[in-house]
């Protein structure tokens, strides 16, 4: 994944330093694109170890339409904990652990009616179910889009969706996906996002009877936090290793039937993990 290392170097060399919401400070560029041929290996970063289990559990959580971190906690995944504290959720009148209309809600219940207690009726638009049906019945459509960004609700959550919109494209029996990410934490977040959407593309391709094409990552405000510069420079000293392979249970024909046990990576080699603080 040399293209990812090239992005780190590009930001360090050419980015502009600016303040940010968290008070940490960033070095940022605006508008960047990376392309990964999914037939040539699974794009899980090798220049530092990435916790694939957390990526899988989070994606399954999104697909459930869930917005409470209890499912993540039950599976020992802590990547959303900073935004699920009592202090954070109380800002929006929600109990600890309830994140509100984040990814799962937008994907599976977009535009739902809010109840007086802050919960939502199940009367919104299920974008994922619609997408699967559309890929199967109208694969040449240019409207194979899922949006995680609802302007009416973006201000009702501690962390509005960073990966905001994704589109699929079918050609020659292969499924490709492009993600637009409005805000891209390149050191911590982007490696997860690349792997998550690559995994989603494989899963949807399987249930739609398609092969896989490309995953295209497009970033808006593409940044390194100021307290990640040293870690990025360390990562740039490491040589990429061969990509691993993804194995899915071939018996699964419904996207919502996938469980953790149905998803496996094979021959993952990586350099050691590099720790870095999360900006909240």
From Swiss-Prot:
Domain of life, source organism:
Bacteria
**BP-aspect Gene Ontology terms:** dTMP biosynthetic process; dTTP biosynthetic process; methylation
Q: Write out the GO MF terms.
A: thymidylate synthase activity
What Pfam families does its record include?
Answer: Thymidylat_synt
Which PROSITE patterns has this protein been placed in?
THYMIDYLATE_SYNTHASE (PS00091)
* E.C. no: 2.1.1.45
Look up the record and name the pathway of this protein.
Pyrimidine metabolism; dTTP biosynthesis
Q: Active-site residues?
A: 162
Which cellular compartments is it found in?
Cytoplasm
Q: Does the keyword Manganese apply?
A: no
Q: Where does dUMP bind?
A: 21, 142-143, 182-185, 193, 223-225
Chief site of localization: cytoplasm
Any one annotated GO CC term: cytosol
Where does this protein hold (6R)-5,10-methylene-5,6,7,8-tetrahydrofolate? 51, 185, 279
* EC category name: transferase
Q: Which reaction does it catalyse?
A: dUMP + (6R)-5,10-methylene-5,6,7,8-tetrahydrofolate = 7,8-dihydrofolate + dTMP
Kindly state which keywords UniProt assigns to this record, in alphabetical order: Cytoplasm, Methyltransferase, Nucleotide biosynthesis, Transferase
Q: Which NCBIfam families match?
A: PRK01827.1-3 (NF002497), PRK01827.1-5 (NF002499), thym_sym (TIGR03284)
Q: Which family does it belong to?
A: Belongs to the thymidylate synthase family. Bacterial-type ThyA subfamily.
Q: How does it assemble?
A: Homodimer.
Record's function text:
Catalyzes the reductive methylation of 2'-deoxyuridine-5'-monophosphate (dUMP) to 2'-deoxythymidine-5'-monophosphate (dTMP) while utilizing 5,10-methylenetetrahydrofolate (mTHF) as the methyl donor and reductant in the reaction, yielding dihydrofolate (DHF) as a by-product. This enzymatic reaction provides an intracellular de novo source of dTMP, an essential precursor for DNA biosynthesis.
Q: What is this protein called?
A: Thymidylate synthase
Source organism:
Acinetobacter baylyi (strain ATCC 33305 / BD413 / ADP1)
């Amino acid at each position: 994944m040399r293209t990812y290392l090239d992005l780190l170097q590009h930001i360090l060399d050419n980015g502009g330093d600016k303040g940010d919401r968290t008070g940490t400070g960033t070095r940022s560029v605006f508008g960047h694109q990376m392309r990964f041929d999914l037939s040539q290996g699974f794009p899980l970063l090798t220049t530092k170890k990435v916790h694939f289990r957390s990526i899988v559990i989070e994606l399954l959580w999104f697909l459930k339409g869930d917005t409470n971190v209890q499912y993540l906690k039950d599976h020992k995944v802590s990547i959303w904990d900073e935004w699920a504290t009592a202090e954070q959720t109380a800002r929006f009148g929600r109990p600890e652990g309830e994140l509100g209309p984040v990814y799962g809600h937008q994907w599976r219940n977009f535009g739902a009616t809010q109840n007086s207690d802050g919960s939502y009726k199940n009367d919104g638009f299920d974008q994922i179910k619609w997408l699967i049906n559309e890929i199967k019945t109208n694969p040449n459509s240019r409207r194979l889009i899922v949006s995680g960004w609802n302007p009416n609700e973006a201000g009702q959550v501690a962390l509005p969706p960073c990966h905001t919109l994704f589109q699929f494209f079918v050609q020659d029996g292969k499924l490709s996906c492009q993600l637009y990410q409005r805000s891209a934490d390149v050191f911590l977040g982007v490696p997860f996002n690349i792997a998550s959407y690559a995994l989603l593309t494989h899963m949807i391709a399987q249930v739609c009877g398609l092969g896989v094409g490309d995953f295209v990552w497009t970033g808006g405000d593409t940044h390194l936090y100021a307290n990640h510069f040293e870690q990025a420079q360390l990562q740039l000293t490491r040589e990429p290793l061969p990509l691993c392979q993804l194995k899915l249970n071939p018996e699964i024909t419904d996207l919502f039937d996938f469980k953790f046990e149905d998803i496996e990576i094979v021959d993952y080699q990586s350099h050691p993990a590099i720790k870095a603080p999360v900006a909240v």
